[in-house]
Amino acid sequence: MSNVHELNFLKEKIQELKDQGVYRQLPVLEGPNEAESILNGKKVINLSSNNYLGFANHPRLKKAAIEAVEKYGVGSGAVRTIVGNMDIHEILDKKLAEFKREEAVMSFQSGFNCNAGTIQAITEKGDLIISDELNHASIIDGARLSRADKTIFKHADMNNLEEVLKANRDKYRNMLIITDGVFSMDGDIAPLPDIVGLAEKYNAMTYVDDAHGSGVLGESGRGTVDHFGLHGRVDFTIGTLSKAIGVVGGYVAGSATMRDWLSHRGRPLLFSTSLPPAAIAAITEAINMLMTTTEYTDRLWDNAKYFKAKMSQLGFNIGNSQTPITPVIIGDEAKTMEFSRKLLENGVFVSAIVFPTVPKGTGRLRCMVTAGHTKEQLDRAVETFKKVGEEMNLL
């Protein structure tokens, strides 16, 4: 007889999700993550992937990964501070710094633990973290791990941010303003020039999580800082290596001092095995490609503008997105989930985003258009949206 707890309290919570119509099961992808993929045994147009540039199954990245496995093996075998810091890790960090036009970079195992580890390492008791209210969960968790005080400012509200800075400038040793570069649920871009201007006025540091800006905005995907021409004015820039780059990992770009400190106090670096050689090699190849051509980012933006125009013409509410992220805002959580299920039945996979990821009453289908989509695929997706929208009396 098992002594494992029944976890009835969790069963009750799961039943609540089912009663609310927001319970979901993990979809199973069979094969590579591409514009058309096999999901749960069915071929679908994939509008849910963060694979912005189509790099996740690119032959050049796969070739680089295979060659790295043959030379270095399948794993690094240790944390970076012991014997898991291979020469290719150092090469990647230097390549990323060159790409981002920063002095130095430290790469991490994921974007999430990059935020969680960096925020905790660069702040302490006597500091103040000032965070946009819509920042990513990894920023929230990173701030929770810090001993610094925390406060939020209204989303992209510069008047409110200045009020917070003015009220606290004499109370703390350091103030750190944290913002997403691109907000993942709405696709809007942070007013970074204004944020940097206020930071300089009140002697605060700036920290930009550019998970959805890296590989998308700026010259050939150099990010939000590059997009606004703010090099040398942002203290910390976070990027992921799993979205536009198509592999896995994250990094923080900034000063050599920052990198040196994180090698001593960045807890994910100290206590978790470093990225495997195959991932490092594939990432390096992706960065090489972005540094030599704008082909992929150009195609991404062309597809995004095409899809947005088609959806707007149908009368869907796509919010105020300024990036390829295209939210189709339904509102009601149960209807949002139903819309997603009906799309899947008709061969289009789009994730339903509902509370608690977004506020109640703002459920949406987050469409992720990529460089890998063809116009024909996007047209089929739009027609499917139209069909389901009419069936549900939403058009």
Curated annotation (Swiss-Prot):
GO terms for molecular function: 8-amino-7-oxononanoate synthase activity; glycine C-acetyltransferase activity; pyridoxal phosphate binding. The modification N6-(pyridoxal phosphate)lysine is found at K243. Pyridoxal 5'-phosphate binds at G111, F112, S184, D209, D210, A211, H212, T240, L241, S242, K243. One of its GO terms (biological process) is biotin biosynthetic process. It holds the Pfam family Aminotran_1_2. Pathway: Cofactor biosynthesis; biotin biosynthesis. It comes from the Bacteria. Keywords: Acyltransferase, Biotin biosynthesis, Pyridoxal phosphate, Transferase. Its EC number is 2.3.1.47. Substrate binds at R24, H136, T357. Gene3D superfamilies: Aspartate Aminotransferase, domain 1, Type I PLP-dependent aspartate aminotransferase-like (Major domain). Its cofactor is pyridoxal 5'-phosphate. It catalyses: 6-carboxyhexanoyl-[ACP] + L-alanine + H(+) = (8S)-8-amino-7-oxononanoate + holo-[ACP] + CO2. Homodimer. Catalyzes the decarboxylative condensation of pimeloyl-[acyl-carrier protein] and L-alanine to produce 8-amino-7-oxononanoate (AON), [acyl-carrier protein], and carbon dioxide. Belongs to the class-II pyridoxal-phosphate-dependent aminotransferase family. BioF subfamily. This is 8-amino-7-oxononanoate synthase.
